[in-house]
Amino acid sequence: MRIRVAAVATVLLTLAAQSFAAYKISVWVPPWNANALTSIQLNGGAITESNPIWYSWNADYSIAKEWNSENPTWRSSMSGLLMPTVQNAVNGSFDGNASAAMLATAATRDAHANALTQLAVSNGYDGVDIDYERVPTASRANFTTFVNGLAAKLHAANKKLSVTVYAKAGDNENWNGPGSQDWIAIGGAADSVKIMAYDYHWSTSAAGAIAPLDWLDQVATYAEKTIPGSKIMMGLPWYGYDWPATGGASNASFASAHQTMLTNNAALQRDAASGEPYFSYSGHTVYFQDAAGYAKKIDLLKQKHGGIGGFAHWAAGVEDPDIWKVISGTPVTPPPPPPVTPPSSGSGGTPVQSDFLVSGPTTMTVMQGGSVSGDFQLVPVNGFTGTASVAVAKTFSGTAVPGISMIAAGSAVKIYVTATAAPGTYTMTVSFTSGATTHQQSVTVTITPNTARHRAAKR
């Protein structure tokens, strides 16, 4: 990975902390991802509502428990309002036909609404988030009736209702799913409406941006026409896709995308229409999310749709850790370089050769199962204008440590630690090389134990 002095690959994100204070921040928490728990434990102070995916359906429309719904560690780690997500998934797949059957009669609608209300009351939840997908368009009126009835029951019990909906830019999208969702009616009944403003390009489509900016603008514009602004939660992606030349895409997290890019020596590019990073390798095209792309989406929505209630996110555990700096208002920027005193001229006034220094953090701390990033900057000395490659040592103190991986991307070095990596203090070496000249900086890395161990369930 090569960088130029004039364009060090570090993104300055200047969203002020107070600018986010007016917005709610919710996060869907997939319990089948072992990294999700660590993510919310590390960043709970920024979260105003947690939506763990804890419940689905049985074949008779009753509520089925999913992973970790009764795990005390998971529950105690949730921040803000605790509103578990219930999905209309039967045997692992969203079931529109089962939904149509449940919605078809007043008796089954009422029984299902009672079950959801009892779920919130008996478990002490603040409410529920329903994510009912692939519901047939023909069930639109019945779905509206159901949402109205469910909201009334939850509100009578002093509980809240969140309804997750497909993104759309108008009410003319009548395919199963968005066609069943009357935003005016849902917005009138629910306490919040989470709009899944992602999957513009999806796993079986052609490769492309997951949430283009102009499309986000259109979706938000329609939302403001149909839903009270304070109830609008724009759902943003934290995930990516890896599309092969033929066939469907596989999911890509920030970490896995970076690893794929480095393994294949691919050139990172950025899509102007979405702000999303992407790259290609061996017939594949990968789009994913990072802090810079996320900031562009947030900037657009705040500037043009500042009256919305907040932002929802899919999903904890797959994100660029620096996204939390954007949310908290912490600038994502390298530390200031140390003062540099150019060497004096040689005898006879002959200029000395230009050179460079490496500036970056000297200590980094990361919890088991987490990740941490540090930005390293090339500092020119005596007029240096060349390029330099960045490398990171693959061992700690000369010894390979299982469960630890390091990635150099531009000037950013990121460390990923599995839940089983041994706690301790290690030394990492970051090297900048230009021609025959190499300068290094040693970094002390401390891995702390994660006391909230849990069984990692898989989906």
Language model features by range: what are they?
Residues 22-115:
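Glycan-recognition patch characteristic of GH18 chitinases/ENGases
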Residues 16-17:
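N-terminal signal peptide c-region/cleavage motif recognized by signal peptidases
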Residues 50, 130, 193, 234, ...:
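Conserved, mostly hydrophobic/aromatic
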Residues 30-44, 106-121, 174-184, 290-303:
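Short, acidic/polar
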